[in-house]
């Protein structure tokens, strides 16, 4: 937000330097990025009156005689296409300094003496993006009242101090001059002085000319006024100066008025050419799939059902809250203007502007919030300005659809609550003084008082917000300072810390690289891979929709990282993360979410590169499962893998739930090809585990098992069974035989082919037996194999080959 110090002083009677003001604002909660004076570095720039202008034959040059307040006119050679006799211009006399510290000297051009330079605004250092288009390719023409020889700075307000504020999402009220004025008035104990406009209305009612309606719950209110017989022309110089100093290009008096109101009230507005309407009813609704709109920048925008549009005759004429449409824009022939003042859902506007990469001053304010109480006041103010600057006739009244609460919000607390949290000994009189400076109403006493918070401060809704306001105005530098008190802690890791350290070591030993992803994501991604989604916990004032909800899974964030790396030609990835997910079992507005530690990893690409000995090997489900098997083995935990098709974003044939003591603690598998395509990533395998469940299941004592000196015996068995029987089912059947000496089950072959009946497969296992106290005999092992074979036959219908 760029704040004009001159304009601010018109609204608040302060007598401090811009630097002192910036320092004070920074220490009370609104950071000042810097102060800029447009005239800084410029010198000897004066008003010139072009007395005569003659074309130089066979060139684009003009030989001008210019009155700069000296005894005799000054001859200047100028190449600007818009220079002519009779206009007032900017003249840099010899010795002047212009942009980039360039010094002007006397010189000769084509043999003609030139005693100075007639300047454009670009040559004074102003950006092309804010210069009026009529002067973008030529020199700036000054107002008629400019006096030759005067310094030009006061005519263009280049001597103003422009204070750049860094506005956080919770202080969007300061995205307006009135909001900044209220803040400065509170800091210095002053009162604000806002100019009033005398609106003269005609006998004809606005309702006779226009009708408005709302057809979406994302449009909170929509109001319009009509101004007839306007004369579209350039704005007066003071208004152009003000807009350029705020970083906005002047267009014409009608559009400039809407931008002025935007800066003054923080209320985005739009002006339509009424005569270009095909109907006299305006409807604000959601766009339909397949609709499109050519916006004011000449770009055709394809719309989705997530976008809001303003329609006339059921055709979009504006992209609500973002940019108007080209078909109804104000031009030099416009005579009747429809003014729009509305409030749109900030999340919807953020999605639209982000999707289209179309950020504007209006969309920024709708995203962060506008003052409900001044929507109609801003509309009336704009109409009065058009009456004043465009000689328009304002129709009586306004038309409006949708009502907004405008009364103050009441928040109650006590003096003890404030003092305990600030460590102060403030009196109730101190509290009264502070809220009086802020312009807030106050009733009650020190035991219990209620503050009436104006709608312009929509960031204040709970007692803690009041404490912050008190601290800001009282002065952070006045708060007592104390050293933190902390008792000694035992020099050992907690069980949670120990588990995190062990899992981290195992993951890195398996070749995984740790990442840290955002805990905040989009509402859609927050629940994308959650096994059991809960209520969403969303920020009230998010910086962007991409960081608006607390995650309920970690995989979606990892896939964002995978996509980032793949887009940069890094496709062989093995990543892991240990972090928190946030489960909300109750209303998020009433209680905080539960924070649960999770472990997740993602692998894609090649696990082994091609070389002279081996072929390249791509990652697959078994690589992902192998990582987990190693993890569980080192944690001394026994889990089950159960195939599942219930996770919508996972491959239905290559995904398994992970069960520990019959409870689901996570999943492993391939990301669904459709989801992978949406993320623009290759075939990727992921897993996610609940570390809290792992910690709870860890054995309390580690029992040492002596390494036996007796050898193990191995037997292989090949099974013919139905194609649908899983490896886990076979392992369960083998274990259910109850053979104590069975120490290891290993699958070493799976075969389906011409020698196997259709619908069947062959699976071969290696079974390891060992007695820690004695040698095993062949007869004992044969009995074990007989029990296992019987179990396999009875439970899975296996045929031993």
From Swiss-Prot:
- Gene name, per UniProt, is pheT
Give a Gene Ontology cellular component term annotated to this protein. Answer: phenylalanine-tRNA ligase complex
Q: Which family does it belong to?
A: Belongs to the phenylalanyl-tRNA synthetase beta subunit family. Type 1 subfamily.
Q: In its UniProt entry, what is this protein called?
A: Phenylalanine--tRNA ligase beta subunit
- What reaction(s) does this enzyme catalyze? tRNA(Phe) + L-phenylalanine + ATP = L-phenylalanyl-tRNA(Phe) + AMP + diphosphate + H(+)
Cofactor field: Mg(2+)
Please name the InterPro entries in this protein's record.
aa-tRNA-synth_II/BPL/LPL, B3/B4_tRNA-bd, DNA-bd_dom_put_sf, Fdx_antiC-bd, Fdx_antiC-bd_sf, NA-bd_OB-fold, Phe-tRNA-ligase_IIc_bsu, Phe-tRNA-ligase_IIc_bsu_bact
Question: What does the entry comment about cofactor binding?
Answer: Binds 2 magnesium ions per tetramer.
Entries under HAMAP family matching the protein? Phe_tRNA_synth_beta1
Give the location in the cell: Cytoplasm
Quaternary structure, per UniProt, is: Tetramer of two alpha and two beta subunits.
Provide the taxonomic classification.
Answer: Bacteria, Bacillati, Bacillota, Bacilli, Lactobacillales
Residues forming the tRNA-binding domain are 39-153
Question: EC number(s) in its UniProt entry?
Answer: 6.1.1.20
Please tell me the species this chain comes from: Streptococcus pyogenes serotype M6 (strain ATCC BAA-946 / MGAS10394)
């Amino acid at each position: 937000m760029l704040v004009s110090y001159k304009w601010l002083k018109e609204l608040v009677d302060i007598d401090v330097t811009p630097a002192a003001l910036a320092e004070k604002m920074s220490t009370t909660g609104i950071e000042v990025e810097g102060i800029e004076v447009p005239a800084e570095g410029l010198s000897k720039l004066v008003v010139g009156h072009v007395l005569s202008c003659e074309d130089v034959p066979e060139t684009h040059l003009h030989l001008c005689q210019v009155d700069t307040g000296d005894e005799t006119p000054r001859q200047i050679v100028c190449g600007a296409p818009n220079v002519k006799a009779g206009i007032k211009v900017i003249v840099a006399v010899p010795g002047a300094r212009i942009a980039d510290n360039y010094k002007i000297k006397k010189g000769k051009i084509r043999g003609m003496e030139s005693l100075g330079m007639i300047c454009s605004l670009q040559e004074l250092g102003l950006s092309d993006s804010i210069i009026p288009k009529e002067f973008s390719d030529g020199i700036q023409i000054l107002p008629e009242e400019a006096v030759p020889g005067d310094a030009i700075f006061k005519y263009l307000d280049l001597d103003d101090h422009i204070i750049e504020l860094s506005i956080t999402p919770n202080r969007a009220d300061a995205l307006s001059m009135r909001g900044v004025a209220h803040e400065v008035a509170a800091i210095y104990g002053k009162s604000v002085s806002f100019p009033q406009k005398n609106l003269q209305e005609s006998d004809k009612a606005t309702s006779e000319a226009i009708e408005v309606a709302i057809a979406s719950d994302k449009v909170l209110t929509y109001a319009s006024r009509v101004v007839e017989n306007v004369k579209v022309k350039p704005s007066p110089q003071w208004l152009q100066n003000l807009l350029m100093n705020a970083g906005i290009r002047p267009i014409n008096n009608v559009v400039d008025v809407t931008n002025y109101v935007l800066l003054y009230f923080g209320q985005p507005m739009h002006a339509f050419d009424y005569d270009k309407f095909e109907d006299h009813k305006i409807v604000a609704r959601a766009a339909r799939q397949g609709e499109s709109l050519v916006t004011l920048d000449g770009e055709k925008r394809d719309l989705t059902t997530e976008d809001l549009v303003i329609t006339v005759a059921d055709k979009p004429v504006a992209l609500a809250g973002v940019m108007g449409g080209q078909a109804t824009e104000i031009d030099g022939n416009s005579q009747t203007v429809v003014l729009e003042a509305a409030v749109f859902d900030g999340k919807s506007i953020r999605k639209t502007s982000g999707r289209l990469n179309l950020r504007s001053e209006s969309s920024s304010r709708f995203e962060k919030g506008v003052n409900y109480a001044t929507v109609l006041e801003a509309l009336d103010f704009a109409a009065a300005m058009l009456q004043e600057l465009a000689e328009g006739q304002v129709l009586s009244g306004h038309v409006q659809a949708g009502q907004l609460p405008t009364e103050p919000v009441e928040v109650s607390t006590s003096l003890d609550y404030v003092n305990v949290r600030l460590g102060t000994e403030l009196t109730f009189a101190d509290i009264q003084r502070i809220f009086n400076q802020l312009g807030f109403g106050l009733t009650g006493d020190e035991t219990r008082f209620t503050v009436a918070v104006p709608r312009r401060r929509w960031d204040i809704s709970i007692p803690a917000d009041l404490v912050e306001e008190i601290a800001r105005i009282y002065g952070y530098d006045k708060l007592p300072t104390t050293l933190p008190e902390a008792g000694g802690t035992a020099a050992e890791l907690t069980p949670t810390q120990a588990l995190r350290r062990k899992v981290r070591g195992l993951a890195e030993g398996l070749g995984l690289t740790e990442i840290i992803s955002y805990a905040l994501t989009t509402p859609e991604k927050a629940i994308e891979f959650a096994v059991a989604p809960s209520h969403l916990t969303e920020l009230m004032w998010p910086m962007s929709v991409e960081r608006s909800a607390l995650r309920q899974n970690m995989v979606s964030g990892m896939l964002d990282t995978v996509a980032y790396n793949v887009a940069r030609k890094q496709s062989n990835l093995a990543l892991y993360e240990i972090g928190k997910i946030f489960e909300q079992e109750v209303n998020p507005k009433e209680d905080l979410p539960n924070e649960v530690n999770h472990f997740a990893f993602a692998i894609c690409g090649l696990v082994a590169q091609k070389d002279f000995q081996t072929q390249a090997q791509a990652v697959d489900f078994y690589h992902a499962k192998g990582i987990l098997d190693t993890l569980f083995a080192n944690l001394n935990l026994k889990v089950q893998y159960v195939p599942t098709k219930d996770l919508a974003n996972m491959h239905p044939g290559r995904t398994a739930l992970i069960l520990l003591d019959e409870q689901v603690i996570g999943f492993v598998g391939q990301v669904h090809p459709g989801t992978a395509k949406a993320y623009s990533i290759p075939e990727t395998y992921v897993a996610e585990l609940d570390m809290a469940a792992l910690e709870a299941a860890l054995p309390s004592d580690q029992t040492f098992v002596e390494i036996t000196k007796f050898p193990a015996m191995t037997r292989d068995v090949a099974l013919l069974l139905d194609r649908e029987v899983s490896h886990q089912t076979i392992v369960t059947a083998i274990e259910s035989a109850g053979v104590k000496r069975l120490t290891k089950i290993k699958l070493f072959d799976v075969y389906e082919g011409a020698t196997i009946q259709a619908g069947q497969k062959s699976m071969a296992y290696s079974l390891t037996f060992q007695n820690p106290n004695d040698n095993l005999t062949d007869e004992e092992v044969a009995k074990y194999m007989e029990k296992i074979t019987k179990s396999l036959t009875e439970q899975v219908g296996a045929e031993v080959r």
